[in-house]
């Protein structure tokens, strides 16, 4: 009897769960939006992707190619209905023309259980007026002039990275796993350029700064489950006070940043890094606020306190630790697999070296290298670190095509996504997209690229604010590596990278193995 009652109870709970999971699945049919049939609980995410057997990136590209003729199509992310834009004109409207209606990212994941928590104060998480205030405060921090001041700090990290490679070669080890190598490099760059501390993750591979960075960026089962549950049940997750980030990691950075700020203020120390630039932005912000004659209510008055500053440092760390290393890994992979591109890049590097003579490489010379820029741009086309861009509709809105015809009627809080990776792999935008062709971005051909089909750093005012710094990190190390070493594939290097990627991460199963051969004295 107990077994029967238990079976009935389990069946009833299962039925409720099923009904709950499919409740939203009529959303796009009611609105006449093209979509593919979802499956309970997962929506349009295949089981094979969830189990790590296939790539979500490849799946999303294929889905785009099947539905792109509709300009807007629907995708169920678990049970959440998402509008995907495939038409450049609609992307322009959302990202540029009607930005005030599409200012914010989706709610939930980045806010955690406490809206006053540090992570909710980062530029990525802020919304509406508060975001605009912080963006305008931070924008002067990321100008070319300010980034140029960090070049020497990053160049020192380049030297440490190249010295490590040479030590490996001298010891008889010619093969290198690039993702780990580049992650250690980006860790050291962030440590010095953002937090003002010197670490060498090549000589001290288990240093605390690097270990915490790995814990923050690694994709664990529990971390993935938390993200999924925040998407499905954000209110419940907040009520249960489940933190998005490990608070021990947050406390580590809090002590690091606040300690550095206190010491610099007491000792009047000036160092051209992110903490200094943010402290300057904070001082400038407070001076403007004190001198302002605004009559707004005090509760609406903007602020930029130490927690706000810490939040931007944390964002800088979490955004730069993984994405720059990923870009470096894929750029090196493409140079390995396309030796003619590597040789052409080497020719430009040698020409620059000859032009410099005895002078060291500087920021302006590096950023002025045309073919290097083409190589990195093409790498970002094939392998954009941020594959998806999201926006939330702030009010009811009609999206219209170039002819003025209404394509879709959006409602307040509807979620709109732009599949950057799919746009970059669409043959209508980039012919033979699987081919690595840096010439797409040279002076002769770059005008052929349709506007709003190449978005490696996002679109509009909410595009990546730190893209100049990221590009400097990537280009400066690629310059030094190609100058000194010939990059070659090994037996462990995947010939078909897209087929080697699985799950939700932009990472091949075999990792990034590379053979390096010295070119002789640089």
UniProtKB/Swiss-Prot annotation:
One of its GO terms (molecular function) is iron ion binding. Heme binds at residue 464. This is Cytochrome P450 9c1. It is found in: Endoplasmic reticulum membrane; Microsome membrane. May be involved in the metabolism of insect hormones and in the breakdown of synthetic insecticides. Keywords: Endoplasmic reticulum, Heme, Iron, Membrane, Metal-binding, Microsome, Monooxygenase, Oxidoreductase. InterPro entries: Cyt_P450, Cyt_P450_CS, Cyt_P450_E_grp-I, Cyt_P450_sf, Insect_CytP450_Detox. Its cofactor is heme. Signal peptide: none annotated. The gene is Cyp9c1. The lineage of its organism: Eukaryota, Metazoa, Ecdysozoa, Arthropoda, Hexapoda. GO terms for cellular component: endoplasmic reticulum membrane. Its EC number is 1.14.-.-.
